[in-house]
Amino acid sequence: HDHSHHDHGDHSGYGTGRERIEVLEDIFAENDHCAAHNRDAFDAHNVQAINVMSSPGSGKTTVLQHVLAAAQAAGIRTGVIEGDIETSLDADRLGGYGAQISLLNTGNGFGGECHLDAPMVAVALSRLDLSALDLVFIENVGNLVCPAEFEVGEHRKLMVYAVTEGEDKPLKYPVMF
């Protein structure tokens, strides 16, 4: 390449005329640090944690009812961190399966978030007796966009998908899939 370019304009393709700003700080750094502490707490008590995610109404709570019943029958000690924007309806549904339940209403003191993040899960963990548990399910707020991007300290992610949601969802929400 032996010639110079005199056009130093924005060639980003956005055509906004606005200046592009380079972000030098990981916006998830604080969350990820807290997620690592949550994972350390689970690991210190030999507890496996599963982050359960899906769209609203796709069946997370129903799946958990069946899993908790089977776990109780098998003698597996379970806990649930139940994330919901406003109500305790799902937490109430899960209350009869021998699991410790810690409810997080994201609309109550957490700004109405559409997902759980690691600091919220840390609050919920403080309400559980991890020494009395083998397995914790983190039922995230129903949403296909935000929950997939936030680590909360889980060992595994589980996505519940209802076929009635349409075959285009993996294309529209690739981070979740």
Please describe what each predicted stretch is.
Residues N143-R156, V160-F177:
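Conserved C-terminal guanine-recognition region of P-loop GTPase G domains, centered on the G4
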Residues H1-G15:
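Long, basic/Gly/Ser/Thr-rich N-terminal segments
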Residues Y14-D40, A44-M53, S58, T62, ...:
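Nucleotide-state-sensitive switch-loop elements of NTP-binding domains
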